[in-house]
């Protein structure tokens, strides 16, 4: 029992640390500053779209066998493979991991060495990532036993200072659109995209520790999920509160990274800034290690060993290093249109997969993906157009904004279930041959 509890805590800490990356440090304080006295609404939405859905995704994939390919398998095997590959690339070498290296430089290194070039920071950062991830079996232990406790201690010091500060003042806001803002801000962490893939990493580690029975594995996964969620919810809430408590003195239009640095410096002074920098380093490092490992394991799995884990790691880290030189804000802006499109699809698949045994037809999944995908595609194209100074599909995007639940950022919910219902009825009437995938 003691071994199982210890293993649950270690793996839970590791999962928390992998999820809790650069984006997770940057976005909650930003929500707090912009929401002011209504920070709780925005934070609740953020908690739903990130840790809650992410942990649910991990649990669902574990129940389906532990492979990310099981998400979307009932739409079509090729769709499942393509979706998983896209998610791996987004959370790996394209957006999430490069952002960890860029954040380490902008939040920590530049604070003390303003003239230090980005490439030196990235070279050292990704050198460490390569060193740890190259030894695949040591990844979860390295994160859970050593890096996470250090990270939590640093964050604890910051949290205490934020909570006990005597002169906390909250900006007055009307609360309009804060739930939608908080929900969609959670997209940027990309945790929901990575959750199905991380489930495989966690399941592999659980098996390595000697838990071979499926029931024991699921119980372990459930406990790991509870530990990770509790830590994530606590940390996010306190970070958001920290921002809200200083919302009258911080410019809400400032860059997210600069906003975080200012909050901590005001709370703890120069020593606090140093602590925050170290927290960023550890948060970014643990996330980069976890996601890079996931990328290597995924491509080794789908290629049936033809693409080795170590070769994938070498290429992935090299690409991450190059893209990290773009910078945090540029990476965030580039990610918005893509995430706007793919997140509704992923959330729809996770929700339906949670009740997989009660969904009789494969086409029900297809209908849900079509409904969510159309809304996400229109909004993604419009968002990209606006970033480029245009307004392509602006009228259609405005019309979608009138859909039920749009004020909560959930305008895709009704089209998703409508699509699922239409395709279910069509299947029941026509009764086409049901596809069965192993």
Question: How should each PLM-predicted stretch be described?
Answer:
Residues 6-14, 40, 77-90, 120-124, ...:
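Select transmembrane alpha-helical segments in multipass membrane proteins
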Residues 10-20, 161-166, 175-242, 275-287, ...:
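Hydrophobic, membrane-embedded alpha-helices of multi-pass small-molecule transporters
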Residues 31, 100-117, 207-208, 288-315:
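Helix-loop-helix connectors at the membrane interface of multi-pass transporters/channels
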Residues 62-71, 126-147, 208-211, 321-333, ...:
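Membrane-water interface regions at transmembrane-helix termini and the short interhelical loops
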Residues 68-73, 234-285, 337:
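TM-loop-TM module centered on a large, flexible mid-protein loop between adjacent transmembrane helices
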Residues 132-162, 335-347, 367-375:
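Membrane-interface loop-to-helix entry segments
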Residues 135-146, 179-182, 202-231, 248-261, ...:
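Hydrophobic, small-residue-rich membrane helices and short re-entrant helix-turn-helix hairpins
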Residues 165, 362-438:
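A generic transmembrane alpha-helix motif of multi-pass inner-membrane proteins
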